[in-house]
Amino acid sequence: MSAIIDALTARDDLDGSRVAVGGISYGGLFAIRTAAADARVRAVFQVSSWYTPAGRFAAMDDLTRPGQYLHHGPDPAANMAAITLAGVCGRAAVPLLQVYGGDDPGSPPSHAERIAAEYGGPVTTVVYPDGVHILNNVWHQARPLIADWLADTL
C-alpha cells in the first residue's frame, strides 16, 4: 500500500495530506494494518472485517470452504489464524470508521468491539441491524455514510 500512497502523493492534482484507506471484508483488516504502518494515512474505514479470521474455516459451509484453499494454501485454518490485528490496532492513531451488518455471522459486530477496544485513535462504529456480509443489501445507505464521514474527517 505504501507504494500506492507514494504514487498518489507524488501527483500535483491530488492533496497528499488527505489520504484515506479503506477496505471491505479482508480488505478492512489490511486497511487498518496500513494505517498503523504508514503515517501519511489520515483516516481509515473498514466494512465487515475481522480482528482475526481465525476459526472461520471450520464454520464455513461446504460450498465456501474449498475455495479457501485457493486463497490460503494447503492449510487455510492455520493461515487464517496467522492473520490478525493483535499488536497492530494500538499503533493506528487516525480516525477509524467501522461499518457492520447485524445479520452477518461471518464477521459479526463483535469484531468491531474488539478492534475498538485496542485501536489507538478515535473510532466510530455503525451497525445496520439487517445488514449482511459486506452490506450488499444496505449499500444504498452505507456508501453515503462512508463518503460523508470521509469528507468530514479529512
Give, region by region, the residue ranges found by the protein language model.
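Catalytic histidine neighborhood in serine/cysteine hydrolases
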Residues: 116-134
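Hydrolase active-site cap/lid region
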Residues: 32-78
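Alpha/beta-hydrolase fold nucleophile elbow
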Residues: 12-25
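Catalytic histidine-centered segment of alpha/beta-hydrolase-like enzymes
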Residues: 131-143
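Alpha/beta-hydrolase active-site loop
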Residues: 1-13, 33
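Conserved alpha/beta-hydrolase "acid-adjacent" motif
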Residues: 105-111
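Short beta-strand/loop motif that positions the catalytic acidic residue
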Residues: 91-93, 98-100, 104
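Glycine-rich nucleophile elbow surrounding the catalytic serine of serine-hydrolase chemistry
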Residues: 23-33
